[in-house]
């Protein structure tokens, strides 16, 4: 009885691990690596959700200010625009508690799919402008970016 149970568990684990490995290999083939930039605030006032490509320090300074603070991790992310560019996804101002975060960036034939997580919460007594900035290898700068709301 114990041998049958052990054999069934081993067979199940083998089956699950072989399926998982295949999905990982196929699924990761078009993933584009990125780093999320931190400690910035948006200067403009967007009236609708928008994706912006930022290809220079000058463009970054026009769109975002540095929001440094004392302590570990307080410096704004440095971006080397000779090697990288930034993708900013910006929402209009809102008085709702909002979580906006990138989930993945995937290369499709002639475009990049930017998948993000958006959660809207309770009304607050103040307004914020949700956004995120990701830093991507410059070899992808000419691709169109398509947004896809996703789930974590």
Regions found by a protein language model. Name each.
Residues 19-152:
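Exposed, flexible binding/inhibitory loops of compact, secreted disulfide-stabilized domains
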Residues 1-26:
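Bacterial Sec-dependent N-terminal signal peptides
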């Amino acid at each position: 009885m114990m041998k049958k149970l052990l054999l069934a568990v081993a067979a199940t684990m083998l089956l699950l691990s072989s399926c998982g490995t295949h999905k990982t290999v196929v699924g990761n083939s078009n993933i584009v690596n990125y780093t999320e930039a931190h400690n910035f605030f948006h200067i403009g006032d967007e009236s609708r959700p928008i994706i912006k490509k930022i290809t220079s320090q000058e463009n970054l300074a026009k769109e975002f200010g540095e929001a440094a603070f004392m302590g570990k991790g307080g410096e704004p992310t440095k971006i080397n625009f000779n090697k990288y560019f930034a993708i900013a996804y910006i929402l209009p101002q809102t008085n709702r508690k909002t979580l906006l975060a990138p989930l993945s960036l995937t290369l499709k034939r002639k475009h990049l799919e930017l998948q993000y997580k958006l959660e809207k919460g309770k009304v607050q007594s103040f307004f914020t402008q949700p956004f995120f900035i990701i830093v991507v290898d410059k070899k992808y700068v000419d691709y169109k970016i398509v947004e896809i709301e996703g789930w974590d």
